[in-house]
Amino acid sequence: MKTLLLTLVMVTIMCLDLGYTLTCYKGYHDTVVCKPHETICYEYFIPATHGNAILARGCGTSCPGGIRPVCCRTDLSNK
């Protein structure tokens, strides 16, 4: 019984997020867990050649510039 209880406690500790961390999209499908001081998910376009644009997504401390920036403070909200 003690072994089962110890196992449950260990699993709980390993699965618990002891400090809230933000998760954002990085690129088109990948996600990234932000550092504790990064509180914003962002998405914007970087101008490229021939009228194309490159999508930039990730975590940040402030809303970046760029074309049509979108910034938010909730998990996976920069899609």
Curated annotation (Swiss-Prot):
- Which GO terms fall under molecular function for this chain's record? acetylcholine receptor inhibitor activity; ion channel regulator activity; toxin activity
List the disulfide bonds in this chain.
C24-C41, C34-C59, C63-C71
Q: Where in the cell is it found?
A: Secreted
- For this UniProt entry, what is the primary localization, expressed as one broad class? secreted
Q: In which tissues is it expressed?
A: Expressed by the venom gland.
What GO CC annotations are associated with the protein?
A: extracellular region
* Alphabetical UniProt keywords: Acetylcholine receptor inhibiting toxin, Disulfide bond, Ion channel impairing toxin, Neurotoxin, Postsynaptic neurotoxin, Secreted, Signal, Toxin
Spell out the SUPFAM superfamilies in the cross-references.
Snake toxin-like
User: InterPro entries given for it?
Assistant: Snake_3FTx (IPR003571), Snake_toxin-like_sf (IPR045860)
The function of this protein is: Binds with high affinity to muscle nicotinic acetylcholine receptor (nAChR) and hinders acetylcholine binding to the receptor, thereby impairing neuromuscular transmission. Causes muscle paralysis, spasms and increased respiration.
The similarity comment for this entry is: Belongs to the three-finger toxin family. Short-chain subfamily. Type III alpha-neurotoxin sub-subfamily.
Q: What is the name listed in the Swiss-Prot or TrEMBL entry for this protein? A: Short neurotoxin 4
